[in-house]
């Protein structure tokens, strides 16, 4: 009976409670909060009017841009880790149910709502960022190996195209499918022991489809939020981002 209760509470936690607090934490948009607190301005009124790292860097410089990036990345890491801690230590729920389903994979479900909160924050009239950094944080918790590949991929595409928006969309799409590849799809909170992961690929494949779906939804949100950027790229009006050289004056 205790196990049935734990399993039921685990479903309530991962499918109802976690999405709620994940959305609220996601709604704490770092760029808006930092610009209001430190500059007495709303970043959404300047340059691209986007509440994200790229625009913060463009308007206020690299230091605030990097701080924004860090804070937006850690949001899904915090929400998913919190869910995992409650699931494992407070509820003491079994990881693998009698039907063979590893319920622990559902701790990642709330990450989607962290990204939704970042893009549509309830605290800021539902006008937030585009979810790139938060997607990155989500990916780190799901698959750190693919996350590293994603960072390298994004930088390479950015160096070639000079478009951060395009780089983010392509990287999100690629990494979404990379988690399906055995050998690099190590999911920490699902496969707690790396050695066991390597020797149980059938178990890995079962859980991978869930996180793939979670990432696919998240990547779709990210791409949708970039719809104006897609139009700007098509009309050659998109602002360029230069990593290792000064930005041309005509690109300000």
From Swiss-Prot:
Q: Molecular function (GO) terms listed?
A: acyl-phosphate glycerol-3-phosphate acyltransferase activity
Q: Which InterPro entries match?
A: G3P_acylTferase_PlsY
Give the metabolic or biological pathway. Answer: Lipid metabolism; phospholipid metabolism
| Domain of life, source organism | Bacteria
Q: Does the keyword Glycosyltransferase apply?
A: no
S-S bonds: none
As for subcellular location, the record says: Cell membrane
GO cellular component terms, A-Z: plasma membrane
Q: Which GO terms describe its biological process?
A: phospholipid biosynthetic process
Which reaction does this enzyme catalyse, per its entry? an acyl phosphate + sn-glycerol 3-phosphate = a 1-acyl-sn-glycero-3-phosphate + phosphate
* EC number(s) recorded for this UniProt protein: 2.3.1.275
The main location class comes to membrane
Topology within the bilayer: Multi-pass membrane protein
Question: Which ranges does the record mark as transmembrane?
Answer: 6-26, 66-86, 104-124, 140-160, 164-184, 204-224
Keyword entries, A-Z = Cell membrane, Lipid biosynthesis, Lipid metabolism, Membrane, Phospholipid biosynthesis, Phospholipid metabolism, Transferase, Transmembrane, Transmembrane helix
Q: Which NCBIfam families match?
A: glycerol-3-phosphate 1-O-acyltransferase PlsY (TIGR00023)
Role summary: Catalyzes the transfer of an acyl group from acyl-phosphate (acyl-PO(4)) to glycerol-3-phosphate (G3P) to form lysophosphatidic acid (LPA). This enzyme utilizes acyl-phosphate as fatty acyl donor, but not acyl-CoA or acyl-ACP.
| PANTHER family linked | GLYCEROL-3-PHOSPHATE ACYLTRANSFERASE-RELATED (PTHR30309:SF0), INNER MEMBRANE PROTEIN YGIH (PTHR30309)
Q: How does it assemble?
A: Probably interacts with PlsX.
Family statement:
Belongs to the PlsY family.
* Name of the molecule in the record: Glycerol-3-phosphate acyltransferase
